[in-house]
Amino acid sequence: MESSTLNENTVNNYIFTPTNKNDLQTAVDLWCENRAEAQNIYGLISNWNTSLITDMSNLFLDKMYFNDNINNWDVSSVTNMTSMFDGAFEFNHLLNSWNVSSVTDMDEMFEYATLFDRKNALWYNFN
């Protein structure tokens, strides 16, 4: 799908479905650098279908100003969330709808995510 052919209605209804971490990382990087361009290419980040992704480690690493709602992401296949929000200082959205039962590694997932409210991820052990 070429971004030049997308109209606003198409963009808002388009669901990006990355098949691997690199595709997802590329989309996240662009979203954090140029939201308008990313939205034209990938649609709204809150609508992305992440059900095929198994590794989200470092996904928002040092994305200091990232603070978008990704509570609807399907993370049920993810096994690695190490440092996922490490350095995402401003991130503070609910993640309570996430099914993290497959995750085996959450080390430093919210390291330096200083504004993150622990109540937004009741499944996470902050010890």
Predicted segments — roles?
Residues 1-127:
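Negatively charged
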